[in-house]
Every structure is written in structure tokens, then in C-alpha cells.
Amino acid sequence: MWRAARGSVCLLCRSAAQPRTALLESAQPWISQRSFAMRRDATRERPSRMVLSDRVARGPRTDAPRRPRDRPDGPWAGANRTVANVDRDRRRRPPGSTQERDGGTRDRDTRDTRERHPGASRNRDDNRFKALKMQRALTSIAYRERVNVKAQGVYNEVLKGMVGVKPTPVQRLAIPALLGQRIGQQRETNHRRAAPESKREEFLLAAETGSGKTLAYLLPIINALKVAEADDVDAKAYNVRLEAEKERRGGTPVSEWIDKFEPHPNHARPRAIVLVPTSELVDQVLAASKKNFPRGQDQTTAASTWSLPPRIFSPTWRIVTLISSRVCTTSSIDEADSLFDRSFAPETSKIVERAMPSLKQLILCSATIPRRLDNYLAAHFPNIVRIATPNLHAIPRRVQLGVIDVSKDPLPPTTSWLASHHGLCQTSARPPRRWPSTLVSKGIDAIALHRDTPEHRQSEMLNSFTTTEPMRLSKAEVEANKQAALAKAGGVSKRHLANTKVIVATDLASRGIDTLAVRHVVLYDVPHTTIDFIHRLGRAGRMGRRGRGVVLVGKDDRRDVVSEVKESMFMGQALI
């Protein structure tokens, strides 16, 4: 009867009448357990011993999350807590669950002592394997981090008293590259792949004005000279003979007899040559090299490098003769856009071609890269490594540009802008002589700098504009300068603008000179190209300092061009 009644009911009604618990119970128990285990295994990370490291050459990541350290809670650790600070993983062992159940692995005396003095046994256990535990704790600290802690003390001593030791963007990119180091995850370029065949490295450093390009290529050059000095056998033998001569002469100063001693084996054989377009840049680069390499004149190989005069007044063939001995291994061309221009290109090409067989590094440096120079480098140096900063061809944003329409009458007074050191640039080959005299007659200390200025006077004029030290004069010195300025003006002016210096210069002072003290630049003529805009306004606002530029616009000048340059400066865009 039951079988017949059950067979007459449809399957849908039968499944609806069956309790849900029966369906759940009918499922196999291993299915849910297996699915849970699969989900748990999918989310679980593989042990580190089973995974190969992908940073063998670079070391472990320093930003990887680390396991938090167990620290004892302080007296206020339970304040402002909403959940009890209870470790759920740590279970309290019930009494009687110790090793007593195992059949007496320890004797009764030890067990009685532990029950009577629980603290004593715990301290004894903690003191066991103390050295191994300390070693295990130190193992988690990478060796590189321990070395960094030691190196920090060296850096503090080396860089003591210096301000702004943080490298600039171009230095952060160029110095490791010139030393043969990779930056981050830098890929191997065509130049690196072709290096074993050509045995020469070629670099282009392109960065904005006042960004520290000189030190970016000068420090690796000094490092190369020191490495070459350590490997030079003739220089080592010369040092031994020199030390013996010092002992023989006793305490006699070396400067008194070094000229009579034998010449250095690398005398007049320069290992590094830096080409610059003007003599002012020669003095500047030489001063920077001596400042960062103060012992260069006392050491042998370095002394031979700097023993040549800072300026060589000779035809090109004389410089070519100096580098014909195949000793020069490094050559740097500063202001490459000028030296590869039509006026300097023939002489520069001769020097580079003559030094090319022995060169190991060729460095080109410039703040502006015209298309002509870009095409020249692509044709003659196809494997050159280009290192450029994001702000290339842009005037620093901390430099403000003002425009004055001189066609309007009356002209606003300009003496209010002379708040500090000043640079006054214009495009003619020689500024009118009446300009400095006119400023002097107004009580302003002004000088003129052009191609007819004697060279010994040029360095003296630029000293006060290239220093970072503020002008601190006593009242007596200020009064003496005032009387001297009034006497120079012929007694025309009865006033004197103290702590202010003005230089009236041509484009001679617009290239490469590190005028750190200049805060204002007045452009008498509107520049014809954006290249001139970048270099002239780049005399102010160097190394992140503030500055201001003023352009005098006449009725025949393009005001729309100046307006676009001003807008680009405000937006921080490149003048392309």
C-alpha cells in the first residue's frame, strides 16, 4: 500500500514535502571540508624558502611589511580599548597536563623544586641559549642596513659645516651613470650593449640653468683621476722617490725645492680635458675643481692634471699636441650648444677627433639643446646616453618676470628694484660707456663687463656676484664706499644706495657663470630667441633661489612674444 501511494506522487511534490535538514544531511561531509581547505590553500602564501628571489643583485625590499614586534604593554596600554587584549592563540594549559603524564621523564626532586619556586626555573630557562637567541634576532637585520648605520657617521663627519648637501635632480641621475652604476630598474641601453666593442662611453647632460651640472660631471672626473693615480706604476715609483727626497732634506718646505726635483712622469700630459667657451668659465670650473679636490696640487698625478695653466692662449694645434700622447681618457664639453655652434664647431671637432682614440668617457653638457645640436649628436654619436631633467628648457618657477613699456611717458622709477645684487644684460657687443657712469651719478655702484674688459678685471668684477655670502659692512666701510662713489661720480649725486652692486654686461655674462648672488636681471633688449631668454633670465634664481626679471619693451618689440614667455614661466612649461 505504501509503495503504491508513494509511487503515485510526483517528484516535485515529493521534494517539497521532504524536510530541508534531510537534504543537508544527505550531502557528503567531505565536500564542504575539501572546498574550505581549497579556499584556505589558495589564499595562503607559499613559504619563503620555496620562492626564488627576484632581487638578488639589488637586495631585499626595504618597504616590505614586517611582522610587528612583541612589546610589553605600558601602564596605559588598556586605555581607550573596546576589545580585551587577549591572545586567543595562546591557550592556558590545564593542571595536570604537563610531562607528569608521560611516565616521569623528570625526577620528583626537580618537579617539587619547580612547584615551590616557579620563578627560579623560568629564569634558568630564559638564560639558556642566550647567545643563539641574540644571533637569531640580529640575523633579521640586513647587512646593508647595519653598514648604512656605520656610514651615516662617516657622512656626518665628511659633510660637517656644509649646507644643502642634497644632490640636485641632474646630479642624482648623472653621477651614478658616469660612475657606471645603474639607477633603479634602468634597462640596458644600446650604449651599454655596444660598450665592449667601442670601449667608450658617451653621455649628454641636459638640465635647466643653475641646477648643478658642473659638479655632476666634475666629481666623476675627479674620481676617475684618483683611480688612475692608484693604478699608475710610474706615479707610484715617483712617489717613493719623492718621499725619500723629503726625508733627505729634513723639514725643508717642498715648495722651495720641488722645481729642482725631477718632473712628474705625467707632466704636461692631461688625463682629463674640460672645454668651455669663455675664460670666465675656465676660472669658475677650475675653482670648483680645487674646492672639491683641495689636495690636487700636492698629489702627483692630480698635480700633473692641474699643472697646466688654467687658460691656454694658443692656436688649436697646440691643444691638439697636448692630447696627442694618448693619455687623455676623459673629455667634457660644457655649454655644448655654443662649442658646437658655427663659430666654435671646427676647433671643437678637431680636438674631439684627436682625443677620440684614447677616450673612455665623453661628456656633453648644456642647458639648451637646439635641433641642430640634437641632429648632430644623433648622426655622430648614435649610442650616446641622454640624461635630461623634467624641467629642461624651462625657466625656474621661482623667477618672476615683469614687463615695462618704455614707450609710455613718464617711465616708472627703476631704483626701487635695486634691492640687492643686480645683473643688467643687453645684446650689443659693447654697452655704451655712459650707462655705468649714469648709474654711478645716481649713487649706484655699477661696473661694465664686455669683451674689451681686461681679463684680470673680469674675475674681480664677478667675485661679488658669484659668492653666496651676504654683504656685511660696518658703518665705517659703508661711509667710505659712499664717499668713494660720490667722488667717482664727480660730486653730482648727494645720495648713495648702500649694499647694492650693478653689473652692465653683454651676453658674455649670460652663459654658465654661477651668479648665485644675483636676484634681479634687467633685459634692456628683448631676446630674439627662447635660448637667449633661458640663459639671460637664468642668471637669477639659481639652485632654487628666488629671483626677478624685468624686460624693457619698446614700440618696435614683439609684446605678444614676451607675453607668451611670461605665461609659460608662470605655468612652469618649457619654452619650445
UniProtKB/Swiss-Prot annotation:
<comment type="similarity">
    <text>Belongs to the DEAD box helicase family. MRH4 subfamily.</text>
</comment>
<feature type="short sequence motif" description="Q motif">
    <location>
        <begin position="164"/>
        <end position="171"/>
    </location>
</feature>
<feature type="domain" description="Helicase C-terminal">
    <location>
        <begin position="439"/>
        <end position="576"/>
    </location>
</feature>
<keyword id="KW-0547">Nucleotide-binding</keyword>
<dbReference type="GO" id="GO:0005524">
    <property type="term" value="F:ATP binding"/>
</dbReference>
<protein>
    <recommendedName>
        <fullName>ATP-dependent RNA helicase MRH4, mitochondrial</fullName>
        <ecNumber>3.6.4.13</ecNumber>
    </recommendedName>
</protein>
<keyword id="KW-0347">Helicase</keyword>
<feature type="domain" description="Helicase ATP-binding">
    <location>
        <begin position="194"/>
        <end position="387"/>
    </location>
</feature>
<dbReference type="GO" id="GO:0003723">
    <property type="term" value="F:RNA binding"/>
</dbReference>
<keyword id="KW-0809">Transit peptide</keyword>
<dbReference type="Pfam" id="PF00271">
    <property type="entry name" value="Helicase_C"/>
</dbReference>
<feature type="compositionally biased region" description="Basic and acidic residues">
    <location>
        <begin position="38"/>
        <end position="48"/>
    </location>
</feature>
<feature type="binding site">
    <location>
        <begin position="207"/>
        <end position="214"/>
    </location>
    <ligand>
        <name>ATP</name>
    </ligand>
</feature>
<feature type="compositionally biased region" description="Basic and acidic residues">
    <location>
        <begin position="55"/>
        <end position="73"/>
    </location>
</feature>
<dbReference type="InterPro" id="IPR014001">
    <property type="entry name" value="Helicase_ATP-bd"/>
</dbReference>
<feature type="compositionally biased region" description="Basic and acidic residues">
    <location>
        <begin position="99"/>
        <end position="128"/>
    </location>
</feature>
<keyword id="KW-0378">Hydrolase</keyword>
<keyword id="KW-0694">RNA-binding</keyword>
<keyword id="KW-0496">Mitochondrion</keyword>
<dbReference type="GO" id="GO:0005739">
    <property type="term" value="C:mitochondrion"/>
</dbReference>
<keyword id="KW-0067">ATP-binding</keyword>
<dbReference type="InterPro" id="IPR027417">
    <property type="entry name" value="P-loop_NTPase"/>
</dbReference>
<dbReference type="GO" id="GO:0003724">
    <property type="term" value="F:RNA helicase activity"/>
</dbReference>
<dbReference type="GO" id="GO:0016887">
    <property type="term" value="F:ATP hydrolysis activity"/>
</dbReference>
<dbReference type="InterPro" id="IPR001650">
    <property type="entry name" value="Helicase_C-like"/>
</dbReference>
<feature type="short sequence motif" description="DEAD box">
    <location>
        <begin position="334"/>
        <end position="337"/>
    </location>
</feature>
<dbReference type="Pfam" id="PF00270">
    <property type="entry name" value="DEAD"/>
</dbReference>
<dbReference type="InterPro" id="IPR011545">
    <property type="entry name" value="DEAD/DEAH_box_helicase_dom"/>
</dbReference>
<feature type="transit peptide" description="Mitochondrion">
    <location>
        <begin position="1"/>
        <end position="35"/>
    </location>
</feature>
<feature type="region of interest" description="Disordered">
    <location>
        <begin position="38"/>
        <end position="128"/>
    </location>
</feature>
<comment type="function">
    <text>ATP-binding RNA helicase involved in mitochondrial RNA metabolism. Required for maintenance of mitochondrial DNA.</text>
</comment>
